[in-house]
Amino acid sequence: DLTCTLYSFTGKPTQVKQVHTVPGKETITEVRQHTYDHADRLLRTSYQLNTDAPVTLVDHVYDELGRLKSDRRNGNGKLRSDYAYNVRSWMKSVSGPLFSQTLNYQESMAGTILCYNGNISSMSWKAGSETTDRGYRFTYDGLSRLKDATYGEGNDLTTNPNRFNEQITGYDKMGNILKLKRYGQISSAAYGLVDDLSLTYNGNQLLAAKDIATSGVYGNGTDFKDGANQTTEYTYDKNGNLIKDLNKNISSIGYNCLNLPDQVIFGNGNSILYDYGADGTKLRTVHTTGSTTLTTDYCGNAVYENGVLKMLLNEAGYVSFPDKKY
């Protein structure tokens, strides 16, 4: 690859041109244009692929205090987000057509213990065209460690309560979680306990996780899969790297001289292999599942799967191939 960069007098990159070449394949040229305001804050990034028309990846607007006020991606109004802050410049809300979220600190809400130290006392969100808020109320112990996340819906989070609660019922003296309960959907019309975990440690290293919950999560939800019942389910090397995870059926994890994982071997024979450059940059991943092998190569911001260009990564996401969609 060849990369050429133009800079402003203050050292900010104003144009970056990348030429990506692979023998026998089409040459790809990417050009990024960066625009800044009087305070050298990024205002806009445009992107041109080969001879296609340039597109705007990101637009930034700042308030009088220099905080990000809004951004828009790909020039699409639906991908706009507006940001609001309180008087302490703590994030208060993110709002947009596709997702909105509100964070509360000392603001009053039914059943909420107000927080004046920066802890979030409650949060709520809506996605897409949803009209009902979903959210959590949080409680903490005397060391500001999370104790309870209580789920609810509606303006005061009192509708459909407790469906997706999480409870941490104990910490050890070093702050490690000893017991954790998670609730979720257990059938088409019922909600209940899906995880009841007890965690044991050797110092700060997790040794085992035992789940005594009798119900599994329903549908496409996720819960902890207790794949082993051993005294030691997680094993580490002398550098503290995890080398075995019985709950995930990982029989071996190998590391290179940079302490980066270079192979993961599963008990069923499946494997993941990683290759890196001398600086630790990941260059290749090889997933082997049964008789199927998927090789992913990382060439700068270009990602190939089995030798075919899959995507080009950029500041706003990626360009997929061969359809060239942003």
Please provide the spans of the model-predicted regions.
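Short, ordered secondary-structure scaffold segments
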Residues: 1, 101-134, 200-248, 293-326
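Beta-turn initiation residues at beta-strand->coil junctions
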Residues: 1, 5-7, 15-23, 44-51, ...
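Short, small/polar residue-rich loop motifs at catalytic or cofactor-binding pockets
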Residues: 1-2, 28-30, 53-56, 77-79, ...
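Outer-membrane beta-barrel transmembrane domain signature of Gram-negative proteins
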Residues: 2-46, 218, 222-227
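A residue-level detector for well-ordered beta-strand positions
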Residues: 4-5, 34, 60, 81-83, ...
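Structural signature of Gram-negative outer-membrane beta-barrels, strongest in the C-terminal barrel
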Residues: 25-93, 163
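Short secondary-structure transition motifs
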Residues: 87-95, 173-175, 179-204, 254-326
